[in-house]
Structures are given as structure tokens and as C-alpha cells.
């Protein structure tokens, strides 16, 4: 039997970290087992579902690199199938029409809560019996599933072990609303059956739905899949994860300069582990992942840890991989890389100093864009009259260079220090500010090499003019 998992988000909001982790676990298990991964959009909530949210979910999945083998399927395009199964259950007396008005149900719910009783639908309540008896052909009705009254529902959760619920704890679930639309708990069963889903991986907030859904599987004669319910993700303060903890949409992490691999590596560790290992390649994730290794305990979201992972991948990933995602940030900042060094060379030089791709894009700017002003603090400290001789000598030497490479530029700087009998800082720091416009950069010789001879000459010339003007105004 082919293993088949699915990710089935509701498009009532963007793809957030909790949903992304669920998708990742489902995707990894399918890949690990040589199976298939299905993407399904559960858009039966017609009032809250939006095309914007659907687009954001698809974009987030694509950005993370979680490709799907089937789909995306849309529940709103399967209403005929759901109605077919509702009619079948009605014909088999496994479902029935309920004419009880919402106002009465709300009233009874309030009475139960006031009495400290778990709110649930009671088909035998006198008021409900009376409401159904008073119905006419024109009365509005919903369809309820006739849940078994005796026995228990038992299933072996792949994360939590054996779970057992008495049927007496479950009420008769609405499977079709008064407006004719099917409900979540019914649709998900039909979809998972039709799509051949063998393992359902989802959040622990769905545990209460599972016994209800299992009874529907049995009523329609469908095989029951295995279930794995993952613990919640909490903030680092133990509270429910929210925006202040970093619970933002996946695409916001892209916008803030995170690499997909860093986020995936972080998400897999939020509830799963393999010894003390922290860094996992995609191949390792797929080979090592198992549902049984998912923790039963809630995980705490730590933005600092995610940032550390992002820095790790910027430093160690193949420059071509980083460049693929850096390019988007460069374009957002209107940095044209057509006239300048290869992006991969810049990443190799600057990447180690950056925690995010935004920082990397900012640190890459001076390789591609000229500037008209120097960073004020750096210029005040280093572009002083005392630096004039060093910059002038470097300028004459670089203009005379026939081969533009890091080694020759290193010799230029070293020879300048020797001839002027000054330390490296007296030459290197003014030169760094001159060619980059700022006080911090990687090694100045390697930086100059990538900036290119023409730009270096022009910028040192501009720095000398800045010093001359400063001297004149002193």
C-alpha cells in the first residue's frame, strides 16, 4: 500500500509557523516512506475563506520547497460528492434532518453551561423533540450524523499512544448546514477516503474531532487512516504562541531575510529530535524522520535560535543557494547587480558577517551602487587630513596595477604602510571608508578586488576631495 499524507489548511489566514510545521512533518513522512504528499485547500467556510489566503498558502509552500504530488484540491469543488454521501447516510438512517432552530440550540447551550454540564446536542431533549415535531415541509433544517450511542472509539495515535472515547460523550454532529453547505468534520473524512490518505498528521487541537470522524469513516464503509497529533507550539514564556513571539506568516520570514532551509531546520526541531543534532540537511531530515519520534510535549518558539540557524546557513550553504534567495532582496532594495561582481563572490566574502539576507543585501550595496556621501561617523574618524598621504599613495599604486587581484592589492596596502612607516590601521581604515563608504567591511584587499578598479579609483579620489574640503574648512 502506498503511503499518502496530506496538508489541508483552511484559507482563512496566511500560512503560519504551526501550519508550516504540520505540513513539514506530513511531507517528510511521505518522502521517508517513498509515498505521496497531497495538498488540499479546505475552503468550506465560505464567509472567511479568501483567494488572498489561498495564494499566500501556495506561495509559502513553494518558497519552503515542499512540493506536492497531488493537488491542490479544493473542497468547494467537491460539494456534489459530499451531498452524494450525505444522501447515502440519510437513506441508510445513519443521518437525519434536524429542524431545531439556532436560537433554541443557543438557549439550551447556555442552560447546560450554567448547570456546569458539557454543552452537547441532545436529540431527546423535550424542547428539541417538540421543535422537530412542529416542523413543516418549508422549515429550514440541517443534517446530523447519527452517532452510535453505545461502545467506544479507540485509536492508536502515532504520537500519543492509545486514545479511547466513549460514544456517550459524542453528540450527533451536523454534517450539512441549513444553507446546504457541508461541514468540516464530514468533508475531511470523505476527502481522506477518496484521496487514499493513509496517515493524518495534524495539531493536537484536532484530537476531539478524531473520534467523531472515525465513526463517520465506519458509517460509510471507509478504511480509517492512522493519526498523529502534534503538540502545540508555545512562546518562550510558555504562553500560547502569538505575533509577539514570532508567530507570523511564513512569507514574513522571507521578507525579514530568512532562508527556507533555516526555517525548515528550525521547524523540524520544534517537537522532533535526533539525539543532540541541531543541523539537518533536507536529505537527513527525510532519512531520519519518523512519526513516533515526535514529542508529546509542547515546544517553545525561540526567535534567537532561528536567527542563529539563519546565520549558520548563510555562512555554510552553497553560495548559489543563498544567491537564489538574496536576489529577491536585492531587487526589493533596487540594487542592480548587472554591473558588478558575481553575487556568489559577494556572498562568500560578506555572508559570514550577516544574520539575515536583508543585512547581506545592505552589505552588498557598495559592490554595485556608487554613493555620494560617506557614513558620517566613519568619515569623521578616518577621513582626516592625516590620512591624505596614505590614500594618495594607494591611489597611485592601484592606478598602476596591471593585474587586479587580491594578492596584488594586499601588496599595495602593505607597501604603502612600509613606505610611510605606519601601521596597517593608518592605511586600512581610511581606505575601507573610502572604498565602501562605511567603517566596517570584510578584509579591505578582498573588498577592493570585488568592487573593481574603476570604482576603487573613483572612490579614493572622492575621499581625497572630501579630506581636502574638510581641511579647507578647518
UniProtKB/Swiss-Prot annotation:
One of its GO terms (cellular component) is cytosol. Its main location: cytoplasm. A motif ('KMSKS' region) lies at residues 240-244. It holds the Pfam family tRNA-synt_1c. Keywords: Aminoacyl-tRNA synthetase, ATP-binding, Cytoplasm, Ligase, Nucleotide-binding, Protein biosynthesis. Coiled coil: none annotated. It is an enzyme of class 6 (ligase). Its EC number is 6.1.1.17. PROSITE patterns: AA_TRNA_LIGASE_I. HAMAP family: Glu_tRNA_synth_type1 (MF_00022). Belongs to the class-I aminoacyl-tRNA synthetase family. Glutamate--tRNA ligase type 1 subfamily. Monomer. Catalyzes the attachment of glutamate to tRNA(Glu) in a two-step reaction: glutamate is first activated by ATP to form Glu-AMP and then transferred to the acceptor end of tRNA(Glu). This is Glutamate--tRNA ligase. It comes from Photobacterium profundum (strain SS9). The gene is gltX.
Amino acid at each position: 500500500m502506498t503511503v499518502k499524507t496530506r496538508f489541508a489548511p483552511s484559507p482563512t489566514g496566511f500560512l503560519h509557523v504551526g501550519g508550516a510545521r504540520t505540513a513539514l512533518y506530513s511531507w517528510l513522512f511521505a518522502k521517508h516512506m517513498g509515498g505521496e504528499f497531497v495538498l488540499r485547500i479546505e475552503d468550506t467556510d465560505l464567509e472567511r475563506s479568501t483567494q488572498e489566503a489561498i495564494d499566500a498558502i501556495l506561495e509559502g509552500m513553494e518558497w519552503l520547497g515542499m512540493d506536492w504530488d497531488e493537488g491542490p484540491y479544493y473542497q468547494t469543488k467537491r460539494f456534489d460528492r459530499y451531498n452524494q454521501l450525505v444522501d447515502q447516510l440519510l437513506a441508510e438512517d445513519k443521518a437525519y434532518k434536524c429542524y431545531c432552530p439556532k436560537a433554541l440550540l443557543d438557549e439550551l447551550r447556555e442552560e447546560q453551561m450554567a448547570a456546569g454540564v458539557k454543552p452537547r446536542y441532545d436529540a431527546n431533549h423535550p424542547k428539541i423533540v417538540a421543535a422537530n415535531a412542529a416542523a413543516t415541509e418549508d422549515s429550514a433544517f440541517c443534517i446530523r450524523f447519527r452517532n452510535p450511542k453505545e461502545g467506544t472509539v479507540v485509536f492508536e495515535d502515532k504520537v500519543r499512544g492509545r486514545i479511547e472515547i466513549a460514544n456517550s460523550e459524542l453528540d450527533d454532529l451536523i454534517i450539512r448546514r441549513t444553507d446546504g453547505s457541508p461541514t468540516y468534520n464530514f468533508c475531511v473524512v470523505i476527502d481522506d477516503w477518496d484521496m487514499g490518505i493513509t496517515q493524518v498528521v495534524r495539531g493536537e487541537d484536532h484530537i476531539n474531532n478524531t473520534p467523531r470522524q472515525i465513526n463517520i469513516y465506519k458509517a460509510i464503509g471507509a478504511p480509517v487512516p492512522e493519526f498523529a497529533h502534534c503538540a502545540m507550539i508555545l512562546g518562550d514564556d510558555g504562553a500560547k504562541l502569538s505575533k509577539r513571539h514570532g508567530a507570523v506568516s511564513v512569507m514574513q520570514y522571507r521578507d525579514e531575510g530568512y532562508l527556507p532551509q533555516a526555517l525548515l531546520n528550525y521547524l523540524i526541531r520544534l517537537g522532533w529530535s535526533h539525539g543532540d543534532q541541531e543541523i539537518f540537511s533536507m536529505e537527513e531530515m527525510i532519512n531520519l524522520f519518523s512519526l513516533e519520534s515526535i514529542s508529546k510535549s509542547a515546544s517553545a518558539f525561540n526567535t534567537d535560535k532561528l536567527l542563529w540557524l539563519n546565520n549558520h546557513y548563510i555562512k555554510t550553504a552553497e553560495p548559489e543557494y543563498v544567491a537564489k534567495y538574496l536576489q529577491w532582496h536585492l531587487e526589493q532594495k533596487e540594487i542592480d547587480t548587472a554591473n558588478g561582481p558575481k553575487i556568489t563572490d559577494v556572498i562568500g566574502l560578506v555572508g559570514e558577517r550577516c544574520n539575515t539576507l536583508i543585512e547581506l543585501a545592505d552589505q552588498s550595496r557598495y559592490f554595485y551602487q556608487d554613493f555620494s556621501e560617506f557614513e558620517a561617523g566613519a568619515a569623521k574618524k578616518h577621513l582626516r587630513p592625516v590620512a591624505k598621504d596614505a590614500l594618495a599613495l594607494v591611489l597611485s599604486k592601484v592606478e598602476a596595477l596591471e593585474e587586479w587581484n587580491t594578492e596584488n592589492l594586499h601588496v599595495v596596502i602593505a607597501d604603502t604602510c612600509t613606505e610611510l612607516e605606519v601601521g596597517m590601521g593608518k592605511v586600512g581604515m581610511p581606505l575601507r571608508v573610502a572604498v565602501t563608504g562605511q567603517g566596517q567591511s570584510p578584509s579591505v584587499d578582498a573588498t577592493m578586488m570585488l568592487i573593481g578598479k574603476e570604482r576603487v579609483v573613483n572612490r579614493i579620489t572622492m575621499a581625497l576631495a572630501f579630506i581636502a574640503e574638510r581641511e579647507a574648512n578647518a
